[in-house]
Amino acid sequence: MSKISRRDFLKVTGIAAAAAALTACGGSSSTASSTASSAAASPEVVKKLDKISVAVPNDTTNEARALALLEKNGFFKVKADAGLTATKNDIEENPFNVNIDEVEAAQVPSVLQDEDYAVINSNYAISAGLNPVEDALAIEDGSSAYVNVLVCKDGNQESPKIKALAAALESQQVKDFIDEKYAGSVVFVVENPTDGYDSTVDYDALNGETVSCAATPAPHCEILEICKDILAQKGITLDIQEFDDYIQPNNVVEDGQIDTNYFQHQPYLDDFNQEHGTHLVTVAGIHVEPMGIYGGKQDSLAPIEG
């Protein structure tokens, strides 16, 4: 999908009038600007809002992550002991009367126009045509505990074809692709990238084999396409199975339908195993997708900075 600006994104999701009033590059606002647009442009008006609405992902680890980012940017304070399972019920100081709306992670971009702000995972922001580096009002840095991982069922970690896929994902070729394609929206975290291959794997024995991987569209499937080319040079087929949710990619690996998955960060995997009784383990940590705060009805963080 080609990237569109935040203004164009909001326009196609139903608030063209508000977006048009927030013209860039020194342009003046239309005298016919809506009340919502005027409020977004004027801190004096914004400060009088009764509450500020923020959409966040509703799964445990991503909600806690979103709340931590909001807290860091001054929206409220969360109980010190809430940790990686914090929910909106753990907010203890809320001077701006922030109302948290919990939404399924993939759907958060679709409600952006209805909220003052939304906290969106980078993969879903990218899929929605947003550029996390350019469009987010605030964004995590790359030093995050939320590393996206390659996962298999416990007991299969030493499978040669899974090790071959891990080496491809940890490669310099993947690093170069991520750096060029995403320019900070996705951050490669492997300290010593491989040449695409694992010296302990007998690639001749894998010639003609297939390794399957469940993944979400962007950036995971796009990154796996680089791995497909790397593995093809050794006669290995990478079967990429695309999913749009955060549940089935784990279920199909747990029941043996698919060898691996690549879509989730480590805290989500840990929480999923605990909640569902699955036996999934990390093979390799590949990248971080910095979570960002995006403006819907508001175009800056002025309402919480005054």
Region spans (language model):
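A conserved helix-loop-strand patch within extracytoplasmic ligand-binding domains
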Residues: 40-69, 73, 163, 171-176, ...
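Ligand-binding clefts/hinges and TM-proximal coupling segments of bilobed small-molecule sensing domains
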Residues: 65, 79-86, 163-202
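Short, well-ordered beta-strand elements
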Residues: 50-55, 206-218, 236-242
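Periplasmic-binding protein-like
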Residues: 126-158, 190-198, 283-295
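Short helix-initiation/N-cap motifs at beta->coil->alpha
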Residues: 82-110, 240-251
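Extended ligand-binding regions for polar small-molecule ligands
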Residues: 141-142, 147-181, 297-300, 304-306
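Short, polar/charged alpha-helical segment
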Residues: 68-75, 86-89, 217-248, 252
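C-terminal motif of bacterial Sec signal peptides marking the signal peptidase cleavage site
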Residues: 21-24
